[in-house]
Amino acid sequence: MRGLDLGLLDYVSAWRMMKILHREVASGGDDAFILVEHPHVITVGKHGRTNNVVKWELFVYVVERGGDATYHGPGQLVAYPVVKLRWPLSRYLWMLEEAVIRSLRPLGVEAGRVEKHRGVWVGGKKVASIGIAVEGGVAYHGVAVNVSTDLSYFYHINPCGLHPSAITSLNQLGVEISLEEYKGLFVEAFEEVFEAKVVWVDPAPYLAAAAQLRASPTLLSAPIEAST
């Protein structure tokens, strides 16, 4: 499985890269795995409700994934596997959750699932969100884990229909770990659950190709300073 570590990258560029990789995988190419940290942004799933965005102060996009409104920002690790869907959809979602759950065990964090809500939970609070899309038998979008995220930004939304106070982070749970340190734990757990080896490749050609694309997710709102 190809791995691309993009560091801090705007949402649209990462979305375009997902589109490029999706096309490659659908055409028979190797599966891919993106790791990224986004600047402040809100995305809403295609069947989500825009009234779950309560403060229109950030970039807000409607995207193909399932789920409702969510926030991405600094201190949050986002993983976008772009993979041929070899499993039932419910199993694939379980595997994404399981990768997060296993990644937290070395930190002494006992995480799990809750009935009726996707994602990963600790003590009744959500530490990771999941939302995917499937087109042509290939899954993309993925999972976001709050490591040192500024949780105040979740008050811009009702995250997946929840009250913002239901969201937590590793730092809030008392785990002092950097995004880079956690990244290694997550990759190890992901490889274990998916029985795959991530082989890291240079993202530069993909970033260059993404920069040439004109397609973008649907923009609902932009910060005033970005739109003037």
Curated annotation (Swiss-Prot):
Catalysis: reaction(s): octanoyl-[ACP] + L-lysyl-[protein] = N(6)-octanoyl-L-lysyl-[protein] + holo-[ACP] + H(+)
BPL/LPL catalytic domain span: 27-198
Residue sites binding substrate per the record: R65, G66, G67, D68, A69, T70, Y71, H72, S129, I130, G131, G142, V143, A144
UniProt keyword annotations, A-Z: Acyltransferase, Cytoplasm, Transferase
Active site: C160 (acyl-thioester intermediate)
Pathway: Protein modification; protein lipoylation via endogenous pathway; protein N(6)-(lipoyl)lysine from octanoyl-[acyl-carrier-protein]: step 1/2
Record localization: Cytoplasm
Chief location category: cytoplasm
Enzyme Commission number: 2.3.1.181
InterPro entries: aa-tRNA-synth_II/BPL/LPL, BPL_LPL_catalytic, Octanoyltransferase, Octanoyltransferase_CS
A GO BP entry: protein modification process
NCBIfam families (alphabetical): lipB, PRK14345.1
Function: Catalyzes the transfer of endogenously produced octanoic acid from octanoyl-acyl-carrier-protein onto the lipoyl domains of lipoate-dependent enzymes. Lipoyl-ACP can also act as a substrate although octanoyl-ACP is likely to be the physiological substrate.
Family stated for the protein in its record: Belongs to the LipB family.
Protein name (database record): Probable octanoyltransferase
Lineage: Archaea, Thermoproteota, Thermoprotei, Thermoproteales, Thermoproteaceae
